[in-house]
Swiss-Prot record:
Enzyme class label: hydrolase
Highest taxon listed in the record's lineage: Bacteria
GO molecular function: 3'-5'-RNA exonuclease activity; nucleic acid binding
Role of this protein: 3'-to-5' exoribonuclease specific for small oligoribonucleotides.
Segments traversing the membrane: none
Source organism (scientific name): Paraburkholderia xenovorans (strain LB400)
HAMAP family: Oligoribonuclease
SMART domains hit by this protein: EXOIII
Xref: InterPro entries: Exonuclease_RNaseT/DNA_pol3 (IPR013520), Oligoribonuclease (IPR022894), RNaseH-like_sf (IPR012337), RNaseH_sf (IPR036397)
Family, similarity comment: Belongs to the oligoribonuclease family.
UniProt keywords, alphabetically: Cytoplasm, Exonuclease, Hydrolase, Nuclease
EC number(s) stated in the UniProt entry for this protein: 3.1.15.-
Protein name: Oligoribonuclease
Length: 207
Protein backbone atom coordinates (compact mmCIF):
# COMPACT_ATOMS: atom_id res chain seq x y z
CA UNK A 1 0.00 0.00 0.00
CA UNK A 2 1.20 3.50 -0.80
CA UNK A 3 0.24 6.71 0.91
CA UNK A 4 -2.89 8.35 -0.48
CA UNK A 5 -3.52 12.06 -0.76
CA UNK A 6 -6.99 13.58 -0.87
CA UNK A 7 -8.88 12.98 -4.11
CA UNK A 8 -9.16 15.87 -6.58
CA UNK A 9 -12.35 14.48 -8.14
CA UNK A 10 -15.74 16.16 -7.80
CA UNK A 11 -16.58 15.90 -4.09
CA UNK A 12 -19.56 13.62 -3.32
CA UNK A 13 -20.32 15.65 -0.18
CA UNK A 14 -21.24 19.25 0.40
CA UNK A 15 -19.75 21.08 3.37
CA UNK A 16 -22.02 20.68 6.39
CA UNK A 17 -22.00 20.90 10.18
CA UNK A 18 -23.69 17.49 10.17
CA UNK A 19 -20.98 15.61 8.28
CA UNK A 20 -18.99 13.11 10.32
CA UNK A 21 -15.21 12.75 10.38
CA UNK A 22 -13.99 9.18 10.80
CA UNK A 23 -10.45 8.58 11.91
CA UNK A 24 -8.09 5.73 12.62
CA UNK A 25 -4.44 5.65 13.59
CA UNK A 26 -1.88 2.92 14.00
CA UNK A 27 0.61 3.43 16.80
CA UNK A 28 3.78 1.76 18.08
CA UNK A 29 2.03 0.91 21.35
CA UNK A 30 -0.66 2.01 23.77
CA UNK A 31 1.00 4.83 25.76
CA UNK A 32 0.88 8.33 24.24
CA UNK A 33 3.79 9.58 26.35
CA UNK A 34 6.19 6.90 25.13
CA UNK A 35 4.71 5.55 21.87
CA UNK A 36 4.22 7.28 18.53
CA UNK A 37 1.74 7.50 15.66
CA UNK A 38 2.85 5.60 12.54
CA UNK A 39 -0.23 5.84 10.31
CA UNK A 40 -3.32 8.02 10.08
CA UNK A 41 -6.32 8.02 7.75
CA UNK A 42 -9.56 10.00 7.63
CA UNK A 43 -12.91 9.55 5.90
CA UNK A 44 -15.81 12.03 5.89
CA UNK A 45 -19.40 10.79 5.62
CA UNK A 46 -22.75 12.49 5.62
CA UNK A 47 -24.92 12.05 8.70
CA UNK A 48 -26.69 8.97 7.32
CA UNK A 49 -23.46 7.20 6.31
CA UNK A 50 -24.52 6.66 2.70
CA UNK A 51 -22.12 9.14 1.09
CA UNK A 52 -18.43 9.44 1.83
CA UNK A 53 -15.10 10.78 0.66
CA UNK A 54 -11.72 9.34 1.59
CA UNK A 55 -9.03 11.70 2.79
CA UNK A 56 -5.27 11.32 3.08
CA UNK A 57 -3.82 7.98 4.19
CA UNK A 58 -0.37 8.73 5.54
CA UNK A 59 2.48 6.74 7.03
CA UNK A 60 4.28 8.98 9.51
CA UNK A 61 8.04 8.67 9.67
CA UNK A 62 9.54 7.50 12.94
CA UNK A 63 13.11 6.63 13.82
CA UNK A 64 14.51 3.11 13.60
CA UNK A 65 14.96 3.24 17.37
CA UNK A 66 11.26 3.98 17.88
CA UNK A 67 10.21 1.17 15.55
CA UNK A 68 12.62 -1.27 17.19
CA UNK A 69 10.98 -0.52 20.54
CA UNK A 70 7.62 -1.97 19.46
CA UNK A 71 6.48 -5.16 21.15
CA UNK A 72 6.25 -8.43 19.25
CA UNK A 73 2.56 -8.05 18.40
CA UNK A 74 3.12 -4.67 16.78
CA UNK A 75 6.29 -5.83 15.03
CA UNK A 76 4.45 -8.81 13.53
CA UNK A 77 1.21 -6.99 12.67
CA UNK A 78 2.75 -3.90 11.09
CA UNK A 79 5.48 -5.94 9.46
CA UNK A 80 2.96 -8.20 7.70
CA UNK A 81 0.88 -5.24 6.50
CA UNK A 82 3.93 -3.48 5.08
CA UNK A 83 3.42 -0.49 7.36
CA UNK A 84 6.87 -0.64 8.95
CA UNK A 85 8.51 -0.35 5.53
CA UNK A 86 6.18 2.54 4.63
CA UNK A 87 7.05 4.35 7.86
CA UNK A 88 10.77 3.98 7.22
CA UNK A 89 10.39 5.30 3.66
CA UNK A 90 8.03 8.14 4.61
CA UNK A 91 9.11 11.77 4.80
CA UNK A 92 5.83 12.85 6.45
CA UNK A 93 6.01 14.21 10.01
CA UNK A 94 3.15 14.68 12.47
CA UNK A 95 3.15 18.39 11.56
CA UNK A 96 2.96 17.60 7.84
CA UNK A 97 0.09 15.18 8.41
CA UNK A 98 -1.75 17.72 10.54
CA UNK A 99 -1.58 20.33 7.77
CA UNK A 100 -2.67 17.95 5.01
CA UNK A 101 -5.58 16.51 6.97
CA UNK A 102 -6.83 19.87 8.26
CA UNK A 103 -6.81 21.23 4.71
CA UNK A 104 -8.81 18.23 3.51
CA UNK A 105 -11.33 18.26 6.36
CA UNK A 106 -11.96 22.00 6.03
CA UNK A 107 -13.48 21.38 2.59
CA UNK A 108 -16.25 19.25 4.09
CA UNK A 109 -16.69 20.22 7.76
CA UNK A 110 -16.28 23.52 9.63
CA UNK A 111 -13.83 23.36 12.54
CA UNK A 112 -15.26 22.33 15.89
CA UNK A 113 -18.40 20.69 14.47
CA UNK A 114 -17.76 16.98 13.92
CA UNK A 115 -17.21 14.59 16.80
CA UNK A 116 -14.22 12.30 16.38
CA UNK A 117 -15.70 9.07 14.99
CA UNK A 118 -14.32 5.55 15.08
CA UNK A 119 -13.73 2.48 17.22
CA UNK A 120 -12.12 2.98 20.65
CA UNK A 121 -11.65 6.50 19.39
CA UNK A 122 -10.64 7.87 22.78
CA UNK A 123 -7.30 6.10 22.31
CA UNK A 124 -6.72 7.84 18.99
CA UNK A 125 -7.71 11.12 20.60
CA UNK A 126 -5.16 10.64 23.40
CA UNK A 127 -2.38 10.19 20.87
CA UNK A 128 -3.61 13.06 18.73
CA UNK A 129 -3.73 15.41 21.70
CA UNK A 130 -0.13 14.44 22.51
CA UNK A 131 1.44 14.44 19.05
CA UNK A 132 -0.96 16.32 16.73
CA UNK A 133 -2.71 18.84 19.02
CA UNK A 134 -3.69 21.29 16.27
CA UNK A 135 -5.57 18.53 14.46
CA UNK A 136 -7.21 17.40 17.70
CA UNK A 137 -8.57 20.92 18.17
CA UNK A 138 -10.28 20.74 14.76
CA UNK A 139 -12.80 18.27 16.22
CA UNK A 140 -15.73 18.84 18.54
CA UNK A 141 -14.93 17.71 22.07
CA UNK A 142 -17.43 14.86 21.77
CA UNK A 143 -16.63 11.41 20.42
CA UNK A 144 -18.79 9.08 18.36
CA UNK A 145 -17.40 5.75 19.52
CA UNK A 146 -18.78 2.64 17.83
CA UNK A 147 -17.25 0.64 20.67
CA UNK A 148 -19.98 1.95 22.98
CA UNK A 149 -22.65 0.25 20.88
CA UNK A 150 -20.47 -2.84 20.60
CA UNK A 151 -20.22 -3.20 24.39
CA UNK A 152 -23.94 -2.57 24.92
CA UNK A 153 -24.88 -5.02 22.19
CA UNK A 154 -22.55 -7.66 23.64
CA UNK A 155 -24.36 -7.42 26.98
CA UNK A 156 -27.96 -6.80 25.88
CA UNK A 157 -28.22 -8.63 22.55
CA UNK A 158 -25.35 -11.15 22.31
CA UNK A 159 -26.83 -12.91 19.28
CA UNK A 160 -26.81 -9.63 17.34
CA UNK A 161 -23.31 -8.86 18.63
CA UNK A 162 -22.00 -12.10 17.14
CA UNK A 163 -23.50 -11.25 13.76
CA UNK A 164 -20.81 -8.71 12.86
CA UNK A 165 -17.43 -10.25 12.16
CA UNK A 166 -14.41 -7.95 12.07
CA UNK A 167 -11.61 -8.58 9.60
CA UNK A 168 -8.92 -7.11 11.89
CA UNK A 169 -6.80 -5.72 9.05
CA UNK A 170 -5.02 -3.22 11.35
CA UNK A 171 -4.46 -0.67 8.61
CA UNK A 172 -5.95 2.75 9.19
CA UNK A 173 -8.20 3.10 6.14
CA UNK A 174 -9.51 -0.48 6.30
CA UNK A 175 -10.30 -0.04 10.00
CA UNK A 176 -12.28 3.14 9.28
CA UNK A 177 -14.44 1.44 6.66
CA UNK A 178 -15.00 -1.44 9.07
CA UNK A 179 -16.12 0.98 11.79
CA UNK A 180 -18.61 2.62 9.42
CA UNK A 181 -19.93 -0.79 8.36
CA UNK A 182 -20.22 -1.81 12.00
CA UNK A 183 -22.26 1.28 12.88
CA UNK A 184 -24.55 0.59 9.91
CA UNK A 185 -24.99 -2.96 11.21
CA UNK A 186 -25.97 -1.77 14.70
CA UNK A 187 -28.32 0.83 13.23
CA UNK A 188 -30.13 -1.89 11.28
CA UNK A 189 -30.16 -4.66 13.88
CA UNK A 190 -29.68 -3.10 17.33
CA UNK A 191 -30.96 0.48 17.26
CA UNK A 192 -34.58 -0.37 16.49
CA UNK A 193 -36.59 2.84 15.95
CA UNK A 194 -40.03 3.28 17.42
CA UNK A 195 -42.92 2.52 15.11
CA UNK A 196 -44.17 5.72 13.41
CA UNK A 197 -47.66 5.36 14.88
CA UNK A 198 -46.27 4.94 18.38
CA UNK A 199 -44.02 7.95 17.99
CA UNK A 200 -46.88 10.08 16.67
CA UNK A 201 -49.07 8.96 19.53
CA UNK A 202 -46.44 9.95 22.06
CA UNK A 203 -46.15 13.41 20.49
CA UNK A 204 -49.92 13.91 20.60
CA UNK A 205 -50.06 12.78 24.21
CA UNK A 206 -47.35 15.29 25.07
CA UNK A 207 -49.44 18.06 23.53
Amino acid sequence: MTDILASTEQPPLVRSDMNLVWLDMEMTGLEPDSDRIIEIAVVVTNSTLDRMVEGPVLAIHQSDETLAGMDQWNQNTHGRSGLIDRVKASTVSEADATEQIRDFLSVYVPPGKSPMCGNSICQDRRFMARWMPELERFFHYRNLDVSTLKELCRRWQPAIYKGFQKRAMHTALADIHESIDELKYYREHFLIPSAPDAANGAEKAAE
